[in-house]
Amino acid sequence: MRRHLQWNIKQLTASYAEGQLSPRRLTELALEDAKNLKTLNAFVRLTPEKALQAAEDSLKRYQNKKPKGTLDGVTIAIKDNFCTEGIPTTCASKMLQDFVPPYDATVCSRLKKAGAVLLGKTNMDQFAMGAGTVDSLYGPTKNIWSEELDGDRWRIAGGSSGGSASAVAAGICYAAIGSDTGGSTRNPASYCGVVGLKPTYGLLSRHGLIPLVNSMDVPGIFARSISDCVDVLNTVAGPDTFDSTTIRKPYKNLTLPEIDQINLSTVRIGIPKEYHCEGLSPEVLETWSKVADLLECAGASVRQVSLPNTAASIFVYSILNQCEVASNMARYDGIEYGHRASDERSTEQLYAQSRAEGFNEVVKTRILTGNFFLLRKNYDHYFEKALRVRRLIAEDFLKVFVASQEDDRVDILLTPTTLTDAPLYKDFAGLTNRDQCAVQDFCTQPANMAGIPAVSIPIRLSQSGLPLSLQLMSNSLNEQLLLTVARWIEAQVEFDSLQHRLNLQSTL
Amino acid sequence: MHYSIIRRLSTQPKLANIPKRKWKSVVGLEVHAQIASASKLFSGSGTSFGAPLNSSVAYFDASIPGTLPVVNRKCVESGIKTALALGCRVNEVSMFDRKHYFYADLPNGYQITQQRAALANNGIMTFPVITPGKKVYYKTAKLLQLQLEQDSGKSLHDDQLKRSLVDLNRAGLPLMELVFAPDLETGEEAASLVKELILILRRLQTCSCKMEEGALRVDANISINQEGDPMGVRTEVKNIGSVRSISQAITYEINRQLETVAEGGVITNETRSWDAENRRTVAMRDKEVLQDYRFMPEPNLPPLHVNLKPGSKSTEDLVSVAALSIEIPELPEDTRQRLVAQYSLKPETAIILVNEPILLDHFLSINRSLSEVPTKVVYNFLINDFLTYCNKLNLNVEDCSINAEDIRDILKNLHGENINLQAARQLIELLHNNPTIKVQELIDLHNLQQICNLEQIEALCQQAITNQPKAVQQYQKGKSKALFAIVGEVAKLSAQKANMKIVVECLEKLLKPPKK
Amino acid sequence: MLRLLNKRFYCKFATKTKVRPEKLNFKQLTHPTKVPQTPVKAAFPNTSANEIELDPKSIQLLERLALVDLDSERALETLKSSIQFADKITHIQTDNVRPLYTVLEQQQLQLRNDLVTEGDCRGKVLSNAKVTDEDYFVSPPGNIPLEQ
C-alpha cells in the first residue's frame, strides 16, 4: 500500500515541509489511482492539468518554506453540484451537462486559496435526489468494499454524495466535499467506511452549491479521520457575504484535544430510543450498544432519551423536499443555460420539452408533486403543516440539549447512521426512489430538519466485510464537543478505512 | 365586437339608457415604484437606465445556479421612509416569498416578493383632486400594503422571426409595490393620487418617478356596480405610460363597462392594456388562463427584522425606523397648509405651487429676496404668466431655462414700473430663447421700457383720440367701457409700452365729458 | 505494477481479506445497555386508501404550472402515492405550533451596502446560453397556451 495513504493530513503536509514527498508526486499518483479505479466511477471528471498546476505551485511554496497552511498540497475531490469556475458542473444531469460555471463556489475558492489540489468532480445522484448514487447521467458509483466489482453483485456507495465518499474510501484523495440535505454525506460515508461530517446549518457557505432544499442543504466533508475532517472544516467554515443563510458569528478554528487529554466524565450521552426502527440490522444494533457501553466505561453518563417525532421526519422531508425542488427547478428552461430543446414554437413548448428531455423521472415526479403541494388550496394542508411538524422535530432536539432541568440534558446523541451495511445494487435498484430514501435516511434526516451538526464514523466491519458506522449529533455550533467525542471513539475502535487495500500490499 | 368599433368613431360614448347616478365606479390602484438606489435589490449590479444590453446583470440576476440573494440596505430604508410618509405601520418582521410563473424575462421561474408579511401595511393618502372646471376637493385612499420586490427583465418581441429577445438589465431592480384599496371613483381622482404620490416620492428621493423610464408604473383595477350592490367584476388595466394617460384610461374603461352593461353584456375578469395611440383599452388575452402562483417562503432569506424602538439608531444589520422617521422631509400637504397660513394663499394657489416644485422654489426664494413686491403679485405672475407660458409650449417647468433670478429681475422691474405686464410677458419668451442674456440687457436690447413721460403719453392719447372718434363719442355719451377701445389704441400706438395707469388717467382728463 | 493492480480488483476474492484481530469484543457489554434492543414502533395511519382528487383538469393545470408532463400512468400513480405518503402527518397535533421556515429565524437578516460590486460581465453571463443574438438571450414568443 502506498505508505503516504496511511498518513493523515498533518503528517502529509509535514512530509511536504521536510521534502520527503512532493505534492506533485502525490498528485500524479492520485491521478493514476483514479484511472486505475475507474470501475468505481467515483469521478465524473478529472482535472489533471489544473491539479498538476496547483501541485506544482504548492511544491514551489514548500521549497520556499512558505506553505499556505494546513491544506497546502492536499488532494481533494468535489461533488459535481458545487460550481467550479471553468470546469463543467453537471449535477449528473443531462440538464446541466454542458454547464460551465463562470464562478467558484465559496467552499471551492477557500480550498483553492488554502493551496489544496482539486483532483476533479465526483459522481452523485441527479440533482442530489437519491440515496445511492445510482441515478446519475454517468452511471452508478460502486462501493470499493464490494465483494466483487464486476457482475451484478457489487454494493452501492450510498448517496447522493457517493462519488466523494468513494474517492476518499479508495484512497484517491485525502478529503472530499459533498452535500447533505437528508443524509447525503453521512449515508455514503457510512457505507464506504469513512468519516462524513454534516456541519451546523449556516456554518459553511452555500454560495455556489446548486441547491436541493435550500433550508436544509449543507456542504459536507469526507475524510479518513476526524483530524483530517477538522483540517478541512477549519479551512472552509465561516460567514460569507454572498450567502444570507450563513451564521454571522466569526468562525474560530477548532482544535481537538489529544486522545489522552479527552475527559469524558463531564460528557452526557443520549440514546434516542426511536432510532431503533424497523429494519435496523442486528449488527448495527450490536455496534450501537457496544460503543454506548465503551463511552459509559470511560466515565460518560449514558442514558436513553426520547425524540418522539422522529418517525415523522421522512414524511415531512418528502413534502418540503418536493416543494423546494418544484421551486428550485423552475429556472431550468434552456434560455440562459442548460439543455435547450428544439421546439421553438412558444416558451411553453420550449420549456416543457427542454425539461422533459433534461430531467430524469425522479426529478420530474418531485417537481409535479411539489407543485401540487404548493397550490393555494393545498398549501396549508401540506406545506405549512410539514413546517409545523418540522418545528416539533427541532424542538425534540432542543428539549434534550437544553432541557430546563440540568439533569435531563444531554450533550451528544449516539445513533446508527444507516440501518444496515451497504446494500447490493440489485436489491437497492428494485425499490422506488422514495422508498430508497425513506428507509436509508431514517436516522440522518432529523438532523437536517433541525439544522444541527452530525457526524458518521466507521466503527467496524460487518460479517460481509462491509463497514458499519454510527452517528453522533449535537446542538448547533457544538462541533468542538461533537468531534472530540467522535475522535475518542475513533481511537478506541481503530477502524482502518483503507483496509480493503491490504490485499494489494505487495503490488503497491 | 364590431359594434363597439362603430361606437368608437364618435368620441363621446353614448349612455342613453342608463341614468348615470344609479351606477358607481370603483377604482383601486397598484403602483410599482422603482427604488432609487445604486445597486439592485438582491445583487450588486448597477441600476442606471440605458446601460448596454445585459451588462448590468450579476450572475444572480441571470439565475445562474448556486447564486443567492443578499438584501440591499438602502432599499429597505427607502421602503421604510416611503411607508412612514404614507402613514403606514412598518412591521417589525417581514418576510420574502417566491411567486412562481414562467416567462422569458423571469429567469428564475419565480419573482422574489413579499406577500404574506410585507414591509408595511395600513397607510393612508389624503390628496387634492383637481378637475378642470370643478372645485378642488380632498379624497382619501387607503394603502393596504407596501412590499419590496424584484423587477423582471425586458423582452422585445420580434414578430417577424417569431421570437423574443431578452435583456436582463432590469431583472432584479428594486421595486416598491403599493397596493391601494378600491377607494377611488374616477380617472381624475386616480391621476391626482398618483401626482401626489410622485410629489412625496420625489421629496423623499426614494424614486425618480420617471414614468417614461418605467420607474413608476400604474395599474388600475376597475369595476362598476349599482348603488347598494356589492362590487362588480373587475378588470385590470395595464400599460399606462404617463400621468395624463391615467385619467384617460380609467375614464375610458369605466365608460366601456357602463356601455357593456347597458347593452346587456357582462364584464369579465380580465387584463386589458391601454392603447394610448387609439385611446382605448384592449383585452390582453382572449382566454383568461387560470393562474396559481404557488407562493412559497424564500428559503435563502431569513426574516427581515427592523428596530421599532423609539430613539434607536440603525446598525449594520438592523435598520431603525425611528432614526429614519427623523429624515422624512416636509410632506406636500404640510407645505400647502403652511403656505396658506404663512402667505394667506388660497388653497387652489397653494396646490398649484406645491404641484410644481420648481415653481414653489421660485416663489419662496423670490418672496424672500424681494420683500417689496406683494406675495400676490409674485404668485400671480408665476402661475398666470410663467406657468401658462410653459404649458403653452408643452414644456416642463424644470426644462425651462429661466431661473428664479431672472423672474426676480422681471418682477423687480415690473414693480418699479420700469416695464409693464406686457413687456414682462415678452421677457419670458425672450429669456427662454436667449438663456445667456440677462433681463436688464434684454430690456435695453428690445426697448421694453415703459413709457411714463407725461408729454409722450399725452401726445399718444391725443393721437388715439383722433383715431377712435366713435369710441370717444360713446364714452362722452356715458358709456364708460368705450374707454378701453381708446386705451387699446394707445397701447397699439406705443407698441404696448405705455404705462397704462397713466394713460387711463390722461384719457380721463382729456375726455372729461362736457356734461354730467 | 499497474496491471497487477487492475487484475486484483477484477478478481473475485476467493478468500476474505485477512481480518484484523478485533481488539474489541462487540458481544460483550460492561453496563446494562441503554440502547433499546427492540424496535420502537411508530404508528402512522395507513393512507393508501385515501382518495386523491386528480381529475384531468387538475392534471392539466399541474402540468402547465410545472411545465413537466405526466407522461405515463405510472407517473400519475407515483404522484398519487406521494400525496398519500404526505397525508401521513395530517393527524399530528400542530395547533399553536408555528411553522419553522428557517432554523435561522432568530438571526438578523444580513444587509448589504448599496454599492455596485457586480455586473459588467456580459460575456460570462451569456456564456452558457445555447442561443443568443447580438448580446440578447433568445426565447420563443410567450403566453401561448400549451397544446393539449
Swiss-Prot record, chain C:
GO terms classed as biological process: glutaminyl-tRNAGln biosynthesis via transamidation; mitochondrial translation; regulation of translational fidelity
The entry's keywords: ATP-binding, Ligase, Mitochondrion, Nucleotide-binding, Protein biosynthesis, Transit peptide
Lineage: superkingdom: Eukaryota
Compartment annotation: Mitochondrion
GO cellular component, one term: mitochondrion
A single GO molecular function term of this UniProt record: ATP binding
Catalytic function, reaction form: L-glutamyl-tRNA(Gln) + L-glutamine + ATP + H2O = L-glutaminyl-tRNA(Gln) + L-glutamate + ADP + phosphate + H(+)
Pfam (any one): GatC
EC number: 6.3.5.-
Disulfide bonds, paired cysteine numbers: none
Transit peptide region: 1-10
Purpose: Allows the formation of correctly charged Gln-tRNA(Gln) through the transamidation of misacylated Glu-tRNA(Gln) in the mitochondria. The reaction takes place in the presence of glutamine and ATP through an activated gamma-phospho-Glu-tRNA(Gln).
NCBIfam families: gatC
Subunit structure: Subunit of the heterotrimeric GatCAB amidotransferase (AdT) complex, composed of A, B and C subunits.
UniProt similarity note: Belongs to the GatC family.
HAMAP family: GatC
Name of this chain's protein: Glutamyl-tRNA(Gln) amidotransferase subunit C, mitochondrial
Biological source species: Drosophila ananassae (Fruit fly)
